[in-house]
């Protein structure tokens, strides 16, 4: 079965053709450079550019896959969560294409796409732990199947990638913040600033994360946390921030490993491409899996891949289905999440 996957939840306009859930025939992504001068994504600009480019991006995906549009068997599209204007563009385009081609439509949760991305490259036996790190989400989950997910912890404020973007914006390090901070950090002292690590000890929050305190310390309280022998430089700020941002993740992950006795972890989302993070995770001495870089960030292939499985199990979505900006509450739930 050939699936066209469409992803427009934020500022990347993506489309891909995937066969039987794992064979990627094409994977096209158009990143919107217009946001760089604002040091962040402007929702109105994002939705307007999606409207402008979505048809050509989908056509390129079909062309690169060396198929005709009539050979598409299913259309999968991200319908939640994300920027509502961007989501509406993708969902409405997918609906129109579904009607025009007389092909079934399945609406997919963006989070499920990220969780599935590593499995497109390597077969991993369930259950395993999953960590999603992106500009919009920081989620630690236990996965028993592709549609059986228990959220163990999530950020209580800023997402990990969001904190990177905000710190980078304040110090004019460039957008997106993640890759630019990682680059600057290579020439900095990661112990120049002793920023606070936020860990929750209450049972109901023991797997949760928080980045607002770190962000505030890094932006407004540099002198308070500076080593007296170090200078305030962008490189030192970046290196120290990056170290603590990822140390914030380690203790909840260790707790989840101990409590579930699961020794397998998959990590996805844009922040998962950070090489410093990957070195930190190595110290956990467990089986760790990452998707390739082009599947870490938002992409249409992961939507097509999980769309194939969801369609086989649950069938098509009703054509009346709408986009939804809110994140699904998966905690202790199982079943249809479209």
Swiss-Prot record:
Cellular-component GO terms for this entry: cytoplasm
SUPFAM superfamilies listed in its UniProt record: Actin-like ATPase domain (SSF53067)
The keyword Protein transport is annotated on this UniProt entry: no
Cofactor: Fe(2+)
Any one Pfam family match given in the protein's UniProt record, by short name: TsaD
Isomerase as UniProt keyword: no
Subcellular location: Cytoplasm
Residue numbers binding Fe cation: 110, 114, 298
Keywords assigned: Acyltransferase, Cytoplasm, Iron, Metal-binding, Transferase, tRNA processing
Main location: cytoplasm
Molecular function GO terms recorded: iron ion binding; N(6)-L-threonylcarbamoyladenine synthase activity
CDD domains linked: ASKHA_NBD_TsaD_bac
GO biological process: tRNA threonylcarbamoyladenosine modification
EC identifiers of the protein: 2.3.1.234
Catalytic function, reaction form: L-threonylcarbamoyladenylate + adenosine(37) in tRNA = N(6)-L-threonylcarbamoyladenosine(37) in tRNA + AMP + H(+)
Cofactor note: Binds 1 Fe(2+) ion per subunit.
Function description: Required for the formation of a threonylcarbamoyl group on adenosine at position 37 (t(6)A37) in tRNAs that read codons beginning with adenine. Is involved in the transfer of the threonylcarbamoyl moiety of threonylcarbamoyl-AMP (TC-AMP) to the N6 group of A37, together with TsaE and TsaB. TsaD likely plays a direct catalytic role in this reaction.
Record family assignment: Belongs to the KAE1 / TsaD family.
Cross-referenced PANTHER family: TRNA N6-ADENOSINE THREONYLCARBAMOYLTRANSFERASE, TRNA N6-ADENOSINE THREONYLCARBAMOYLTRANSFERASE, MITOCHONDRIAL
UniProt protein name: tRNA N6-adenosine threonylcarbamoyltransferase
Biological classification of the source: Bacteria, Pseudomonadati, Spirochaetota, Spirochaetia, Spirochaetales
